A protein has these predicted regions:
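A hydrophobic alpha-helix adjacent to the NAD(P)-binding/active-site core of NAD(P)-dependent oxidoreductases
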Residues: 45, 59, 85-86, 110, ...
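Active-site helix of classical SDR
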Residues: 142-145
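Rossmann-fold cofactor-recognition segment
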Residues: 39-52
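C-terminal substrate-binding subdomain of Rossmann-fold SDR/epimerase-dehydratase oxidoreductases
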Residues: 187-298
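NAD(P)H-binding glycine-rich loop region in Rossmannoid oxidoreductase-like domains
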Residues: 50-88
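N-terminal Rossmann NAD(P)H-binding glycine-rich loop of SDR-like oxidoreductase domains
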Residues: 8-26
Length: 298
């Protein structure tokens, strides 16, 4: 007799990560239901705003999911209105947790996506989960506040918090750096304006990130805060060289002083030892493979 599939609720399912998360869960036997703030004709989709506490409570009472992956957030650090970070990332997440706790069924796992931005700009080198947070912008402060708030619910709900470092893939918006670079190579643009090329960052593949999330859910990593990172750094200069080698196109890179951040940290790298211990065998593709996939656009 076949076991009934587990029901997974993915908030922000129509976002960049949400689409990959849904595919990953469906491929592994989950029944996936999604929410978002915008209308959608997608099946098993419910439009509900995180600000709508009564709407969330009614929906959770109806759905009673086995697992929840909370991805809905304002994720672009350069987003203009600071108060939106707090309304969505902090208050919205609290509304969701309140709705889950009141729904009449305790889920197996509630995975909440935070961000490695909480570590801020004060630390060089390898960052692990014990590195003291030092958020440097409203986005990061909202995510760290969300983490602290979520911990208030840990006696009632099985929560795991992830801190993903930079990740990318096909379909990510061009206001993020790697899709911007890839797009210029795809169009064979003659030139690109960037900031400091000699910063080193930790890049993962979105397909590996959602595998990590599923692995953490299935490992029942409840109560844990977990970095999701490659543990390897690449400079932006190196990223451009890799794209050039893959496409055969040469891009004239112009440094725009407006894009150079003051006091920018040269190297940021995430220690993924905790993730690897919880999800044995997890790894992210080499950056060349991810860039090749993105440049092919499929």
């Amino acid at each position: 007799m076949q076991m009934a599939s587990k029901r997974a609720l993915v908030t922000g399912i129509n976002g960049f990560t949400g689409r990959y998360m849904a595919a990953e869960l469906q491929a592994n036997g989950y029944e996936v239901i999604g929410t978002g703030s915008q209308p959608s004709a997608a099946p098993d989709y419910h439009q509900v705003d995180l600000a709508d506490g009564p709407g969330l409570r009614a929906l959770l009472a109806e759905l009673q999911p086995d697992v929840i992956v909370h991805l809905a957030a304002i994720a672009f650090v350069g987003h203009g209105a600071a108060d939106a970070f707090y309304q969505v990332n902090l208050i919205g997440t609290r509304n969701l947790l309140e709705a889950i706790a009141a729904c009449g069924k305790t889920p197996e796992c509630v995975l909440i996506a935070s961000s490695a931005n909480v570590y801020g700009n004060v630390s060089e080198g390898m960052l692990d989960e014990h590195t003291p947070p030092a958020p440097a912008n409203d986005y990061a402060v909202s995510k760290l506040a969300m983490e602290y708030m979520a911990r208030l619910w840990c006696d009632r709900l099985p929560i795991v918090i992830t801190r993903p470092f930079n990740y990318t893939g096909v379909g990510q918006a061009e206001n993020f750096l790697l899709p911007k670079i890839v797009s210029h190579f795809q169009r064979k643009a003659p030139a690109i304006e960037l900031g400091n090329l000699d910063v080193w960052r930790d890049f993962s593949d979105v397909r590996a990130v959602v595998r990590a999330y599923r692995g953490l859910i299935e490992a029942r990593a409840v109560g844990q805060t977990v970095n999701v990172s490659s543990g390897i750094t690449h400079s932006l200069r190196e990223v451009i060289a890799k794209c050039s080698a893959i496409t055969g196109h040469t891009l004239d890179v112009q440094v725009n002083p407006a894009f150079v951040r003051a006091n920018e940290v040269k190297t940021l790298c995430g220690d993924n030892a905790r993730l690897r211990a919880l999800v044995p065998g997890w790894e992210t593709p080499a950056l060349d493979e991810t860039l090749g996939w993105m440049l092919a656009g499929q």
